[in-house]
Amino acid sequence: MSNIVIVGAQWGDEGKGKIADTLAEKSDLVVRYQGGNNAGHTLVVNGKKTFLHLIPSGVLHKHTKCVIGHGVVVDPIALDTEITRLQDTGIEISANNLFVSESCTVITSYHKLLDAVRENSTTEKIGTTGKGIGPAYEDKVSRKGIKFKHLFDKDVLRSRLALSLAEKETLFKDLYKVEYPSLEEEFERLYTLGQKLKQYSADTFSIIDQAVSTGKNVVYEGAQGVLLDIDYGTYPFVTSSNTSVAGVYSGATTAGHNLDHVIGITKAYTTRVGEGPFPTELFDDTGLFIQKKGGEIGVTTGRIRRCGWLDLPLLKYSAKCSNLTSIALTKVDVLSDLDTLKICIGYKYEGKEIFCAYPGIDLYKVEPILVDMEPFSLDEVVTKENMPSALKTYLRTIENHIGIPISSLAYGPSREQILFFEDYFKKG
């Protein structure tokens, strides 16, 4: 058995879904442990794209069970829509293969409205997706949240909804001056959805614990990336959950169980959606080339992603934050045939050269130390034997700086276009 964690090692959008989908073929359980439908995973199978936001990437494998852990915030409307959309394409989703923690915090219309009006009312944009993620986590922490299991009990749901609305009502009326659904409207909407989704509600704590205890293969699928972590990320331009490996322990069930692999998913370059510092960002034709060739448009937001060179000081920082055991490098093909190729090995900051970022660093004030790398061209199928020497040098540069190995290499959109250097399911 293996317990494998997939963590985004950058600002999200690294290709976690593709790696999770590939590993799901040998997995008994794939578990989402944090975030919500602000995540966006694109899977390409036989040339067909499948977009996922809440449901784990194991859904394309009939033998694999999918779990949404208690650390996830769930929008019932989004969940119902995603289930229906996938079922309409012939993907099997039932109470036999999808399990939603009864303890998940629910996203309401009030959370989404509050998210939107806050973002639109400030001059300092965070770049929120507007999905209500942050406000839902706020209610969770302040003990005003609605749990998934509350959707099925009329009295409890109405009581919890009234508690959640009490403060927001004042904000909507007096501060933001916006219309909002009445308590009864929202109650009816949520209760109706709850009856439809009740079949998926489960004690996921026990499901995961049982799987691990009996030697099953479990993959924990993260959303976003370490650099968006509420504690480790580029605050305040972060999400509202622990996107690092810490989120596995708080948002799923691994207490008393060892993690065999913590894989940091990393693009061969760097991207970021929304606001925030980006030391290696490219503003020239090369950046535009990478954006177009890489199809760098957010699945969830539709926003164009900012692009830049691979940032090793930030990658090393992510590796330390999540105790990564290896790197899965994705989208290497996007860098193929570039005339110029660079990589950031360090920063000049406050009169010093540093080679690993840290929480207190002001990334707006760093000057990236860029080194030229030899460009390379890739064949349609990449093997260890035909891999260009320039690419091998690029990989060694990453490994030497980060201090951990690259365990897989993705060089195209389909699940077949991955070269594995390590068997994650082999012990020892």
Curated annotation (Swiss-Prot):
GO terms for cellular component: cytoplasm. InterPro entries: Adenylosuccin_syn_GTP-bd (IPR018220), Adenylosuccin_syn_Lys_AS (IPR033128), Adenylosuccinate_synth_dom1 (IPR042109), Adenylosuccinate_synth_dom2 (IPR042110), Adenylosuccinate_synth_dom3 (IPR042111), Adenylosuccinate_synthetase (IPR001114), P-loop_NTPase (IPR027417). The keyword Oxidoreductase does not apply. Gene3D superfamilies: Adenylosuccinate Synthetase, subunit A, domain 1, Adenylosuccinate Synthetase, subunit A, domain 2, Adenylosuccinate Synthetase, subunit A, domain 3. Binds 1 Mg(2+) ion per subunit. Its cofactor is Mg(2+). Mg(2+) binds at D13, G40. Its EC number is 6.3.4.4. It comes from the Bacteria. Homodimer. This is Adenylosuccinate synthetase. The gene is purA.
